[in-house]
C-alpha cells in the first residue's frame, strides 16, 4: 500500500508538505502543489480520510442543506451550479460535501440533527434563507459553524455570514426593462412559500410597476403544470387581446419553464401576445423558443463564495468571521421581450 511517505520521497518533499497539500494549505507554492498531486496520481495514492478524521477530530466534509423536493432540485440548473461552485472550492482545500434534501421540514431537521450528533460534517451551508428557520436555530444551539446563501432575516442573522444577490435591485432592473418595451399590464408569478428571495423579487417588481403606474397582479402558485394551466386558461382571453400589451415575469427558470409550456399549449405567442422574463439564467432560458430575457444571478460564483466563506470560518475556528457578500448580477436581453 502506498503511504504518504512514499509520495513525499518521490516528490522530494517532506511528509508534512504532502499533508498540507492534501489539506489545501494555500501557503505552499503552486509548483510544489502541482508536483505533489502529480506524484499522487502516478502512485495512485488516496488519503485515508478515516484515519485523518481520527487524528485531527475533523471530518473534512461540509453539510449542504436544501429545502425542497429532490427531483426539482436535481433538475434545477441554479442548484446544480451552486453545488458545483461549492464543491470546486471545497475540493481545492481537501474538503468534500454531503447533501441533505427534503420538502418536509421535520424530516430535514431530523437529518441535520443526525449529521451533527454523528459528527458527519464539520460545518453547514444552508442553500436558502427563511424567517424563523428551525434548522438555523438548531445549528446555533449546537454551536455548529454555518453560513447561509440568502439574505439575513433578523437581527441575530447579522451575527452570521450570508452570501446573496441584491434580489430587490435585480427585480427592479428586470421589471424596468420590461416596462420600457411598452406594457399596459404586468403579471408576476411566484411559488408559495415564505422565502426571502421571493419577497425581495416581488418587492422590486412592485416598486417599479407602481412608480410607472402600471397595472399589475401577483399570482402565487405551485410548480405543478396543471395548476399553472388553470391560471393561464382563466387569463387566456385577456392575454390574446391585441389592445392590451402584457408581460409575465416569473420567480425563477424552473417555474418559467412550466409557464412557457402552458402558454404554448394555449396558443399564446411570445412576444406577440405577451412578453416573458425571469431570473436564474441557464441553458433552459437560452435555448427556449423564443430565448428568454432573464437576470443571471451567477449561481456558480455564489457557490464558490459560500465554499470560501465556510472554509474561512473553519480555518479561523470562529463563527465570528462575519461577512455579507453580495454577488453581482447581469441582465440578459433576448427575444422574449423584443416586440
Give the positions of each predicted feature.
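Amphipathic helical "hinge" segments at domain boundaries
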Residues: 46-110, 206
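Hinge/beta->alpha junction and helix N-cap segments in small-molecule ligand-binding domains
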Residues: 68-81, 99-107, 163-173, 189-234, ...
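Short, well-structured alpha-helical segments in soluble
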Residues: 108-120, 230-243
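Periplasmic-binding protein-like
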Residues: 121-127, 187-189, 219, 242-252, ...
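Flexible loop/hinge segments that line or gate small-molecule binding clefts
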Residues: 127-169, 254, 280-292
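Flexible loop/turn connectors
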Residues: 232, 236-339
Amino acid at each position: 500500500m502506498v503511504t504518504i511517505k512514499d509520495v513525499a520521497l518521490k516528490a522530494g518533499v517532506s511528509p508534512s508538505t504532502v499533508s498540507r497539500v492534501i489539506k489545501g494549505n494555500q501557503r505552499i507554492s503552486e509548483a510544489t502543489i502541482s508536483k505533489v498531486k502529480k506524484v499522487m496520481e502516478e502512485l495512485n495514492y488516496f488519503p485515508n480520510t478515516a484515519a485523518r478524521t481520527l487524528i485531527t477530530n475533523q471530518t473534512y466534509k461540509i453539510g449542504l442543506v436544501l429545502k425542497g423536493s429532490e427531483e426539482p432540485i436535481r433538475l434545477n440548473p441554479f442548484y446544480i451550479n451552486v453545488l458545483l461552485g461549492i464543491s470546486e472550492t471545497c475540493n481545492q482545500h481537501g474538503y468534500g460535501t454531503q447533501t441533505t434534501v427534503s420538502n418536509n421540514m421535520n424530516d430535514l431537521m431530523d437529518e441535520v440533527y443526525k449529521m451533527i450528533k454523528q459528527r458527519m460534517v464539520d460545518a453547514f451551508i444552508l442553500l436558502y434563507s427563511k424567517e424563523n428557520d428551525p434548522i438555523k436555530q438548531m445549528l446555533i444551539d449546537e454551536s455548529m459553524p454555518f453560513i447561509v446563501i440568502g439574505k439575513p432575516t433578523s437581527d441575530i442573522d447579522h451575527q452570521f455570514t450570508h452570501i446573496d444577490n441584491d434580489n430587490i435591485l435585480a427585480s427592479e432592473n428586470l421589471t424596468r426593462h420590461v416596462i420600457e418595451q411598452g406594457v399596459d399590464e404586468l403579471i408576476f408569478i411566484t411559488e408559495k412559500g415564505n422565502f426571502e428571495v421571493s419577497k425581495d423579487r416581488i418587492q422590486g417588481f412592485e416598486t417599479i410597476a407602481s412608480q410607472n403606474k402600471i397595472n399589475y397582479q401577483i399570482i402565487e402558485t405551485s410548480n405543478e403544470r396543471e395548476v399553472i394551466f388553470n391560471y393561464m386558461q382563466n387569463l387566456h382571453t385577456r392575454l390574446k387581446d391585441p389592445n392590451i400589451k402584457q408581460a409575465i415575469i416569473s420567480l425563477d427558470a424552473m417555474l418559467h419553464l412550466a409557464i412557457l409550456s402552458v402558454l404554448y399549449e394555449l396558443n399564446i405567442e411570445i412576444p406577440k401576445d405577451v412578453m416573458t422574463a425571469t431570473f436564474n439564467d441557464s441553458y433552459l432560458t437560452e435555448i427556449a423558443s423564443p430565448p428568454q430575457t432573464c437576470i443571471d444571478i451567477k449561481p456558480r460564483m455564489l457557490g464558490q463564495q459560500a465554499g470560501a466563506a465556510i472554509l474561512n470560518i473553519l480555518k479561523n475556528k470562529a463563527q465570528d468571521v462575519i461577512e455579507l457578500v453580495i454577488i453581482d448580477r447581469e441582465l440578459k436581453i433576448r427575444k422574449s421581450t423584443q416586440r
